[in-house]
Design a protein with these regions (language model features):
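Generic secondary-structure signature for well-ordered alpha-helical cores
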Residues: 61-68, 83-90, 101, 116, ...
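Hydrophobic face of alpha-helices
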Residues: 56, 75-82, 93, 111, ...
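Terminal low-complexity tails and localization/encapsulation signals of metabolic enzymes
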Residues: 1-43, 76, 80, 130-156, ...
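Residue-level signal for inorganic ion chemistry
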Residues: 38, 74, 96, 118, ...
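Glycine-rich loop-to-alpha-helix module at the N-terminal edge of alpha/beta enzyme cores
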Residues: 39-128
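Rossmann-like NAD(P) dinucleotide-binding subdomain of oxidoreductase/dehydrogenase enzymes
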Residues: 130-275, 327
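Conserved residues at the C-terminal ends of beta-strands
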Residues: 124, 155, 214, 233, ...
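ALDH superfamily catalytic-core signature
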Residues: 237-381
Length: 381
């Protein structure tokens, strides 16, 4: 891959992927921005009830044949899908970076973790054998078999547009379910490319569908009786809402809300190792991940000055700019609203008595002068 991907492209429309085909939909759209430039990259369709119904019908109709497909045949498709993901890794990572903003190294790491789940799904046939117990009772043999649920739905966040969907759909589909993915409308393109690659690998039409949309699309998915299971990763308020709605409608639900994490550095800690861990946890992917240190780092008075000094030195060495430039260590936050929110946190901390040791608000990056924040460090005793 070249040192910098060309991010200057014509604005285009992003639709859906239903029944093995790209589906155009220009009725209601939302802008998709390149966070590194602040420019509109595309317009993504926001599916209405009729489009959602088509995706559900496609998945529902495909379920009977797919659940009857031999596990070994499914595995062959998954091996091919894994191969295509690796062959198209550069293209997938470029889409992640152009729409999310994270640097290419972070995008590659994300994709790699997702492919690990696909690899695990390649061995799913060993997990579908059920159980048999001879003589469980007098003249009684006991056996059980594992059966797919039906049409499953995955609703995923913006911060890991490849990895989090791959937590969900490979396992569901390998087990004989069909699937509808509703990715974040902020960075939808990588999900559509994955759907195309899956079908290229031999997945029958309708087994994997992608519907772009907002709350209206989610509500339509949660209300339809043909949906058997829902998986969600995102903010806690939405996780709670989705759990209530989906369980009320009789669906199996797993809903993972946001995390609030802190770190504690003990007096006998390896300071250099601790600082390296803090750098990755606090600033990796611009801190836009659930396992980021989003609350506080607790340090005793004896170590605080040493840790802050080492952090400050490492921060000064980092290069910040568009994620498409492989020489950069950190890219932009995904939206201007996200940048403003983090800036407000800094101002709130100062108002509450914190000392601003490193102020990241004055960073200027050519081409998007107001779109970037540098790392910041606040200290409070």
């Amino acid at each position: 891959m070249n040192s910098e991907i060309n991010s200057k492209e014509n604005i285009f429309n992003i639709g859906h992927y239903i029944n093995g085909q790209a589906v155009a939909d220009n009725s209601v759209t939302q802008a998709v921005f390149n966070p590194a430039t602040g420019e509109i990259r595309a317009h993504v369709a926001l599916a209405g009830a009729s489009t959602v119904a088509k995706a559900i019908e496609s998945a529902h109709n495909a379920f009977s044949a797919w659940r009857s497909t031999a596990p070994q045949k499914r595995v062959q498709i998954f091996f091919k899908f894994r191969q295509l993901l690796e062959q198209q890794a550069d293209a997938l990572c470029a889409l992640i970076t152009l729409e999310h903003g994270k640097v290419l190294d972070d995008a590659r790491g994300e994709l790699g973790r997702g492919i690990e789940v696909v690899e695990y799904a390649c061995g799913i046939s060993e997990l579908l054998k059920g159980e048999f117990s001879k003589n469980a009772g007098p003249n009684i043999d006991s056996w059980s078999e594992l059966q797919p649920l039906g049409v499953a739905v995955g609703i995923t966040p913006f911060n890991f547009p490849a990895m989090v969907p791959m937590w969900m759909f490979p396992m569901a589909i390998a087990c004989g379910n069909t699937f509808i993915l509703k990715p974040s409308e902020r960075d939808p393109s990588v999900a559509l490319l994955m759907a195309e690659l899956f079908c290229e690998a031999g997945l029958p039409p309708g087994v994997f569908n992608v519907v772009n949309g907002d709350k209206a699309a989610v509500d339509a998915l949660l209300a339809d009786p043909r949906i058997s299971a829902v998986s969600f990763v995102g903010s806690t308020p939405i996780a709670e809402y989705l759990y209530r709605q989906a369980t009320h409608n009789g669906k199996r639900v797993q809903a993972l809300g946001g995390a609030k994490n802190h770190a504690v550095i003990m007096p006998d800690a390896d300071i250099d190792g601790a600082v390296d861990a803090l750098m990755g946890a606090a600033y990796g992917s611009c801190g836009e991940r659930c396992m980021a240190i989003s609350v506080a780092v607790c340090i005793g008075d004896d170590l605080a000055d040493k840790v802050i000094a080492k952090l400050t030195t490492k921060i000064a060495a980092l290069k910040i700019g568009p994620g498409t430039d492989i020489s950069n260590d950190m890219g932009p936050l995904i939206t201007q609203a996200a940048k403003d929110r983090v800036s407000n946190y800094l101002e709130q901390g100062i108002a509450e008595g914190a000392q601003l040791v490193v102020d990241g608000r004055g960073l200027v990056v050519h081409g998007n002068e107001k779109g970037f924040l540098s790392e910041a460090v606040c200290s409070m005793k």
